[in-house]
Amino acid sequence: MKVAVLGAAGGIGQALALLLKLQLPAGSSLSLYDVAPVTPGVAKDLSHIPTDVVVEGFAGTDPSEALKGADIVLISAGVARKPGMTRADLFGVNAGIIRSLTEKVAEQCPKACVGIITNPVNAMVAIAAEVLKKAGVYDKRKLFGITTLDILRAETFIAELKGLDPTRVTIPVIGGHSGVTILPLLSQVQNVEWSSEEEIIALTHRIQNAGTEVVEAKAGGGSATLSMAQAAARFALALVKASQGAKVVECAYVEGDGKYARFFAQPVRLGTEGVEEYLTLGKLSAFEEKALNAMLETLQGDIKSGEDFING
C-alpha cells in the first residue's frame, strides 16, 4: 500500500504525514511531495519514528517520482485561508495547482484513489474530475472531496453541547464543504433530544462557520491544519481498510447519481475500488429539507466554476 501526500510540507501535509506514519499498516510506504525544498527533510525526520512504514520525500516542480505506483493520493497543496478570505478567494491560486497535480496523477497512477483536501473543495473536485476525464482515466468511484472535517466538528460540538462522549457521536454531514453547503443532519443523531429548532439552527451555523472560527483565532497565522490533518487521515485510513476488504462507511464529496448536484457529499460504502455503494440520505427534517434546497444553487455554481476552469 503506497500513499502519496502532495503538499506535504504545509501545515496540513506535515501533520497528515505524521498521522499516516503512525497509523498506516505495517509494510506500507508513504511518499511526500511539495515544491518546498524542506520536503526530503520532513521525510527524514519522520523516518526516525519506529514504525514499519517507509517514508520518502521529494521536492521540486515535478511530483512524478512521488506518484509512481501510488494506491492513494491525498492533495493538500495550495494556499490557505487568511482572515477576510472566503474559500472562493482561494480559487484563483489553487485551481491551477490542482489542475497540474491531477495531470501528473493521470500520468503516473491513473488507478489511484484521489482525495482532495485543497479548498475550495466544491470546485477543486470538479477540476480534478475534468482533468482525469480529458486524460481518459476518470473513474468516479475513485475521486473524493474530503469533507470529513465537517463530521469531526459536528461530532465534537454535539458532544460539548449535550455532555456526551464525542467518540460515540455519529452524524452524516451532506452537501458540500463551504458555508451554507455544509448540512449536518442533526435529526439523525441517535439518543439526542433537541430543545428547539433555534438550538438546531445555531449549531448548524456553528458547524458551517467553524473554519472561520479557526482562521480568526489564529489571527492571521493560518487556517485549520491539525484538525484537517486528522480528518484526512481518518478518511485515508478508511480507504486503506476498504482496500483490504473491510466494509467501511464514510461521508465524502463524490459524483453520485446527480439528484441534487453533479458532486455531493453523502454517505458512501467504500470497497476495494473506491465507492462501492452510494447510500441514501435517510429521512430529513423539514429544516434540513429547506436548507438542502437552499444550498443547491451555490453548490452547483461552485461545481460549474471548476468545470469551466478546465473546459472554458
UniProtKB/Swiss-Prot annotation:
It catalyses: (S)-malate + NAD(+) = oxaloacetate + NADH + H(+). Pfam families: Ldh_1_C (PF02866), Ldh_1_N (PF00056). The active site is at H177. Homodimer. PROSITE patterns: MDH. GO terms for cellular component: cytoplasm. It comes from Mannheimia succiniciproducens (strain KCTC 0769BP / MBEL55E). This is Malate dehydrogenase. Substrate binds at R81, R87, N119, R153. The lineage of its organism: Bacteria, Pseudomonadati, Pseudomonadota, Gammaproteobacteria, Pasteurellales. InterPro entries: L-lactate/malate_DH, Lactate/malate_DH_C, Lactate/malate_DH_N, Lactate_DH/Glyco_Ohase_4_C, Malate_DH_AS, Malate_DH_type1, Malate_DH_type1_bac, NAD(P)-bd_dom_sf.
